[in-house]
């Protein structure tokens, strides 16, 4: 992280969200909704070496200082320079997301861009474009390759559009478009999110700078002996043969 980026991030960390803004200028926030990084890695059977693929800190460091970043996480203790940290609350994904949206609205933000951590191709310029398009649209959606969304931008005054959505059905994008009607939704370019090794293979074929890391991880997986591949593919990676060591690329 460069000096300028670090200064911006440090400023966000020590400064609470400011409620005084120029008249007519909307208050903007980025809502990052994510579990602890080790939980997200284990859920996908990804090794620690894949952490950069699920890292939102790089995007956060590029976002304009005028935009506050709020991380809603399941972690009991979380530090993220430049992020305002909140605990997720709710019985399921939908409730936790809706509660996060309500909290952001209570803090006085007019425009919100909600993202996760599983889209390595997401860039700060995508977030800036989303805020810009909210001037004329009810929603700005970033569709993923399966029909979900890697980004949802909305005005707090119209957050009811997000209530009752059947999330995680790969129909999120279609549901939200249907709710708004023609001409009220702006679509960003389709990007790939990473929920499985199959997604990593697709992502590795692209020209994103992180695609090289994806290729490296795939090469390490397929070069390993069969018994080690079985170990890597286990959901929580908790079982291993006595005295069996993980592949070098996956060592802690």
Model-derived regions: residue spans:
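Conserved alpha/beta core of the MobA/IspD/sugar-nucleotide pyrophosphorylase nucleotidyltransferase superfamily
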Residues: 174-252
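A short, N-terminal amphipathic alpha-helix
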Residues: 49-68
């Amino acid at each position: 992280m460069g000096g300028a980026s670090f200064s911006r991030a440090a400023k966000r960390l020590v400064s609470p969200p400011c409620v005084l803004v120029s008249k007519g200028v909307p208050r903007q926030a980025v809502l990052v909704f994510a579990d602890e990084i080790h939980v997200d890695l284990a859920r996908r059977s990804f090794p620690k070496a894949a952490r950069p693929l699920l890292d939102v800190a790089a995007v956060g460091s590029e976002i304009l200082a005028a935009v506050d970043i709020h991380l809603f996480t399941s972690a009991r203790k979380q530090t993220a320079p430049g992020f305002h940290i909140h605990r997720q609350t709710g019985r399921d994904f939908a409730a936790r997301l809706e509660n996060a949206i309500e909290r952001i609205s209570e803090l006085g933000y007019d425009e919100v861009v909600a993202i996760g951590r599983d889209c390595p191709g997401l860039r700060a310029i995508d977030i800036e474009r989303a805020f810009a398009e909210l001037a004329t649209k009810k929603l700005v959606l970033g569709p993923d390759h399966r029909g979900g969304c890697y980004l949802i931008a909305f005005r707090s005054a119209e957050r009811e559009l997000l209530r009752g959505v059947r999330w995680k059905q790969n129909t999120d994008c279609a549901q939200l478009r249907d709710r708004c009607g023609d001409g009220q939704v702006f679509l960003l370019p389709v990007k790939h999110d990473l929920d499985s090794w199959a997604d990593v293979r697709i992502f590795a074929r692209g020209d994103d700078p992180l695609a090289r890391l994806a290729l490296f991880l795939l090469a390490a997986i397929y070069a390993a002996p069969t018994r080690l591949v079985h170990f890597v593919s286990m959901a929580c990676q908790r079982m291993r043969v006595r005295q069996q060591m993980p592949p070098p690329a996956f060592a802690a």
